[in-house]
Amino acid sequence: MKFLKKIKEFLLNFLNLTKLFSNVKNIAIVLLAFYLSGSIFNLHKIFLGVISLSFISSAIYIYNNFSDLKSDKYNKNKDYYSEAVKYFGEKNTLVLNIIFIVLGLYFGSTINFYFLFALIALFIIGFLYSFKYTRFKEKVILDILFGATLTFLFRFIAFWFIFSISLPPILAVIALVSAKSAGYMLYKEVDRPYLTALKIKNSITIASKKTIITISSLLWFISFLSFIFLCLNSRYFQIEYLGKLPLNFLFLIPLAAPPLAVIYLSALNKIKTQIKYLRILGFCYWTLIMIIVWILLI
């Protein structure tokens, strides 16, 4: 029983440190890039793309947890991240970080130069976000830009380069970047008390809760509007550089309501459930949505 307990403890801390389940979003993004590109399905390339980008994403998460070791232990929404770093030790955490980077870049190099370039850019963005001499996560505007906007932009661009060496569809980029930026603002709004206590001045703490929620809502509106035009474009406009999705994908819009309601209620302090449990529920929910989308595509 002690052995099983140790295995469970190891796995739990490993998952908390690397946030592997958060990489499920990479599957959704690569499927979107594949469909919009109109390319022939290539499971080998898609698999390598998801694996390599997930290694880089987890490397960014690991380094962020390492950099936030002292501050996270005072945040009940993130204290398990600092516990994970302590469990493995700071030295081993950095070693694991390097291993993930090397593996990500190695697998990425087997696809093409453009994909590898996007991976490197993504890592640099994540590094600057958390690095103690830059700490863009504690800077106004730069926190959202490097913590959300650019990260999803380069995730999508990287996957797009698997299928096409060209500019990605504009509407898809706008939809993804707006949604990620909006979600990031709400996610950080939940941490406002801790950020304020640490006297951190970033986009969240210098603005009021009402302002953050208003801007986030506007970004969600832009994202949904872009998605609607992506669907309508396939039948009514036929503008290639905008991107096209099946018209019947419009039914997916109401499915975004439950997770949006949860994150908004959390930001308004109406839900007391810890973020880590909401993440687990979100993982299960979006995995189910991806299965539904895949069934529609085939």
Walk through the language-model features, giving the residues of each.
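Small-residue-rich segments of transmembrane alpha-helices in multi-pass membrane proteins
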Residues: A28-A33, I144-W160, I204-K209, L278-I292
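C-terminal ends of transmembrane helices
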Residues: Y61, K70, G126-K137, I263-N269
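Short, Lys/Arg-rich, polar N-terminal cytosolic tail immediately upstream
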Residues: M1-L15
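Membrane-embedded alpha-helical segments that form the functional core of polytopic membrane enzymes
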Residues: A28-S67, F115-L128, S166-L186
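Helix-coil boundary and interhelical linker segments in multi-pass alpha-helical membrane proteins
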Residues: A33-I51, G104-F117, F154-I174, I228-P246, ...
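Solvent-exposed interhelical
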Residues: S54-F107, V177-F227
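Extended hydrophobic alpha-helices typical of membrane-associated regions
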Residues: Y236-I298
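Intramembrane alpha-helical segments
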Residues: F10-L12, S82-I165
